[in-house]
């Protein structure tokens, strides 16, 4: 059911590539294709005689895209890859969740990241082919796609010399930012990105204009440093208000 909904409007065919007749159908489809995408285990297409390299030699205008867990080569290339494993190994799980334990992102973000990376690379290859007439070989892995998304935590750790702490819905470098409890146990999420928004929150919502110039909260850096104190003030105010009134 999920597969049908996600692939709505697409034409599909199911082939047994170990069957000679079905394999012939596959090769016939490839001969007429602009793009060949596969996510079999590294080396599988070589054994079948339809490696990306051999296909591009036979069809120079063909764009090929090999998707794997950890890349086509290297010590991890033969290992099975699952979304949860990649979330952990890339460090994503370590910056999600609560201060008590790591957390999994609630969607298959590694699969999605690899798909998006493949998509944009294929579009670039199509533009290039319009100019040169030649296809291109593309390799995408779940791990490298997600590792690229982890660039900011990496830079904060390596060059900022500080470990990124898990903060739930809070932001490591912005405050106030996160979910707060209102009257009747309703929840509201706010994200204050600049001093103008901070001033508006204090004067228009919290009705506490004196907080704007308070030394503890006079800059974003100070607000982050005194996050617990600030969150307590906001929760105390919001706790007496209905979400619709905020």
Show the residue positions of the predicted features.
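Short, small-residue-biased leader/transition segments that mark boundaries at the very start
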Residues: 1-2
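Active-site-adjacent "lid/gating" segments in soluble enzymes
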Residues: 32, 46-192, 200
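Aromatic-enriched alpha-helical interface/lid elements that frame and gate functional surfaces
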Residues: 176-246
